[in-house]
């Protein structure tokens, strides 16, 4: 993950102050736009959907920033949580009734990875992405946040509202399943 997790306390104060909120929020968007886009993209796969997730994330964050009570070090986890929930809501709403669970959505998305990557994509990378999308949702979330975003377990716990020990087990199982799928 890009170094965006720690913002200065005075920047958080600027976000909470209605007179300075807009400028501070613009800086926040600049710092988190790219990491949140890639987080969303790994969940929803399609570029346009990821852009929608990020846009909705920042709209919700702007609307609620005045009520945010965490410290400066918790702001990134808060944004990731909003993005994660927004992406999951999008996946649940996609073609209602067609999927019985988010895991069904994951299987459909895995088949779309090859379409998104095109014919020139590295086959190993495509297989890796498809294997990730076939993981159970919780394992996929933990794997993406830990592997791609290099988030410490403590921050992942704040994003997902889970205990660190549970997340470590989920990550371990995800890695084992990926190794198994990729060595076949």
Report residues per predicted region:
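Internal acidic/polar
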Residues: 2-10, 97-121
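Sigma70-family region 2
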Residues: 42-45, 58-73, 93-95
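Short, charged helix-capping/linker segments at alpha-helix termini
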Residues: 16-27, 37-56, 70, 164
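Structural recognition of an alpha-helix C-terminal capping motif at a helix-to-coil junction
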Residues: 38, 52-59, 73-85
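Arg/Lys-rich amphipathic alpha helix in sigma70-family domain 2
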Residues: 63-67, 81-102, 121
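Short helix-coil-helix linker/hinge
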Residues: 132-140
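DNA-recognition helix of helix-turn-helix
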Residues: 84, 88, 139, 145-148, ...
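N-terminal module of bacterial RNA polymerase sigma factors
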Residues: 1-35, 42, 133, 155, ...
């Amino acid at each position: 993950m890009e170094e965006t997790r720690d913002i200065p306390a005075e920047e958080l104060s600027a976000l909470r102050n209605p007179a300075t909120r807009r400028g501070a929020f613009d800086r926040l968007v600049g710092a988190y736009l790219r990491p949140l886009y890639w987080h969303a993209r790994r969940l929803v796969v399609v570029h346009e959907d990821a852009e929608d997730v990020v846009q909705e994330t920042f709209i919700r964050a702007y609307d609620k920033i005045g009520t945010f009570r965490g410290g400066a070090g918790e702001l990134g986890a808060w944004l990731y949580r909003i993005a994660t929930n927004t992406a999951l809501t999008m996946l649940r709403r996609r073609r209602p009734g067609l999927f019985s669970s988010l895991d069904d959505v994951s299987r459909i998305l895995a088949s779309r990875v090859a379409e998104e990557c095109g014919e020139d994509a590295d086959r190993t990378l495509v297989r890796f992405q498809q294997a990730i999308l076939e993981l159970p949702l919780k394992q996929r979330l933990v794997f993406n946040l830990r592997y791609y975003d290099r988030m410490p377990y403590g921050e992942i716990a704040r994003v997902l509202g889970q205990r660190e020990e549970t997340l470590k087990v989920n990550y371990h199982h995800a890695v084992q399943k990926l190794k198994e799928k990729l060595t076949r």
